[in-house]
């Protein structure tokens, strides 16, 4: 557990004040960094960052390395999977369909911003097509698209 390791490292350092922000996903980490304000105290930044990471939902599209059943979903080796904060949100053989269904399952009326980070195995045109589909389906949300370049995860998506 990386958070446990960070807290152990914090306990070992005696000559510095260290605060661990317990993010569990890349989008939570990005949100924490965006909400850092240099003019605020460490305690104020910690409070703000912790509050904001609680508002982030994360989805990640990857592929199955073997046949399995998870969350009552039958998954075949090579299938695309949309993983959410609390389990599998979508499964299928078409990456973009799985990504869109994952986003649909992440959504509710409280979300205002959807950020899509596409990985090294997704071309820009494919990612833009997903963004366009999400924008059309959720016109009340701002939809951002960024090249993340990450391996393994075709898409990392945050909803805030």
PLM region spans:
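N-terminal loops that bind phosphate or other acidic moieties
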Residues: 1-160
